[in-house]
Amino acid sequence: MSAPTILIMAGGTGGHIMPGLAVAEILRQRGWQVRWLGNPDKMEGKLVPARGIEMAPLRFQGLRGRGVTALLKLPLLLTRALLQARKHMAEIQPDVVLGMGGYVAFPGGVVAALRRTPLVVHEQNAVAGTANRWLARMAKNVLTGFPAVLPGADNVGNPVRADLCDLSSPAQRYADRQGPLRLLVVGGSLGAQALNTVVPQALGNIPPAQRPIVMHQAGAQHLQTLQADYAKAGVQAECVAFIEDMASALANADVLICRAGAMTVAEVAAAGVAALFVPLPHAIDDHQTANARYLSDAQAAWLQPQHVLTAQWLADWLTQRDRTELQAVAARARAHARPDAAAHIADVCVAAARRQS
C-alpha cells in the first residue's frame, strides 16, 4: 500500500511558506509523502527543494494594485494556471490538498474542489488574503492563525519552530538579570528601514547610564549604513545582517522592537517576549496592524504605528520600561501561544483524507 500524499500550496513570502514546511515535516514523520505546488521563481523555489520536497511548478502571481493592463491579462493567466494545476493534480493524485496562502494557492485550490479532493485552507493573518477568502468557500476545513478571521473557521494558531516553544518561561529568564535592558530590533530578513533610521536616533537621545544594550538585525543591504548611524549617534550596538539563532536572541532580550507579520506575532507569543510592534504601513488590508492587536489588545505587547514612531517618542518609551513590567507583558504574550498549531493542522489534513477514502 502506497503512502498517503498531501499537496501543499503556498508561496510568495516566508509567512506562507514556513508554516507549510512545519506541517510538511510533521506529516513526513508520520509516513506521508509531501508534494508542493509553487512558483519556482519565488522564495519557495529555494526553500522547498532544500527540504527535500519535490515541487510542482506553477507560475501565477497576484495582480492586485497593478493597474488595468494587468487585470485585462487575468483571464488568460488564470486559465493557464488552472490548466497547469489540473495537470499536476492528475499526476500527483493527492489524498488531501492544503492551501497555506499566496496567489499560487488559488488555482490549485479551485482544481482540488472541482476534482472533489479534500481541500484544507489555513489563513495566517488576522485579515484573510484574497486567495484564501475565495478558497474558504470551497474548502472542507478552514483554519486560521487568529480568531474571527473567516466565517466558521477553526482558530488553531500559526505553526512556529519547536526551539521557540522550548524556551524557558519569562519568569525564569528574567529572574537574575541586572543592569541595562537588553533591546533586540528585528525588521525581518531584509531589515526595516524605518526602524533602522529611528532606533539609533532614539538611543542617542537616552543618557548612557540609562541606555539599553542593543542587538539590531539590519538586513545585509543596510548593514553599513546602520553601523554608521549608530556611530553618528554615539551608541555602541551589535549590528548584524541576519540572526541565525533567533530563539537564543529572543531568549536573551528584555524587549523586542519588530514588524507584525503573522509569523512574527506567533513567534513573539511562543517565545514569551515583550514586544513593541511597528506594523508595516503599506501591507495589504493593513493586516499587520490587525495581527499586532491580537497581543496588544490583551496587554501582551505594545503597538505603535510607523507614522507616529519618532526618535523622541521611542527614547521616552524605552526609559519608562523596567524588567518587572516587561516580564509581566512577556508572560501574557506566552499565554497566547499555540505550540501545537502545526500538529493540529496535520491532524485536520489526515482526518479530511480519511473521510474521503
From Swiss-Prot:
Origin: domain of life: Bacteria
Presence of the UniProt keyword Glycosyltransferase in the record: yes
Main location: membrane
CDD domains membership: GT28_MurG
Top EC category: transferase
Pathway: Cell wall biogenesis; peptidoglycan biosynthesis
Gene Ontology MF term list: UDP-N-acetyl-D-glucosamine:N-acetylmuramoyl-L-alanyl-D-glutamyl-meso-2,6-diaminopimelyl-D-alanyl-D-alanine-diphosphoundecaprenol 4-beta-N-acetylglucosaminlytransferase activity; undecaprenyldiphospho-muramoylpentapeptide beta-N-acetylglucosaminyltransferase activity
InterPro entries linked to this entry: GlcNAc_MurG (IPR006009), Glyco_trans_28_C (IPR007235), GlycoTrans_28_N (IPR004276)
An annotated GO BP: cell division
The keyword Cell cycle appears for this protein: yes
Residues the record lists as binding UDP-N-acetyl-alpha-D-glucosamine: T13, G14, G15, N125, R161, S189, I243, Q288
Record key words, sorted: Cell cycle, Cell division, Cell inner membrane, Cell membrane, Cell shape, Cell wall biogenesis/degradation, Glycosyltransferase, Membrane, Peptidoglycan synthesis, Transferase
Subcellular locations according to the entry: Cell inner membrane
Catalytic activity as recorded in UniProt: di-trans,octa-cis-undecaprenyl diphospho-N-acetyl-alpha-D-muramoyl-L-alanyl-D-glutamyl-meso-2,6-diaminopimeloyl-D-alanyl-D-alanine + UDP-N-acetyl-alpha-D-glucosamine = di-trans,octa-cis-undecaprenyl diphospho-[N-acetyl-alpha-D-glucosaminyl-(1->4)]-N-acetyl-alpha-D-muramoyl-L-alanyl-D-glutamyl-meso-2,6-diaminopimeloyl-D-alanyl-D-alanine + UDP + H(+)
Membrane topology (UniProt): Peripheral membrane protein
Cross-referenced PANTHER family: GLYCOSYLTRANSFERASE, UDP-N-ACETYLGLUCOSAMINE--N-ACETYLMURAMYL-(PENTAPEPTIDE) PYROPHOSPHORYL-UNDECAPRENOL N-ACETYLGLUCOSAMINE TRANSFERASE 1
Protein name in the entry: UDP-N-acetylglucosamine--N-acetylmuramyl-(pentapeptide) pyrophosphoryl-undecaprenol N-acetylglucosamine transferase
Organism: Bordetella avium (strain 197N)
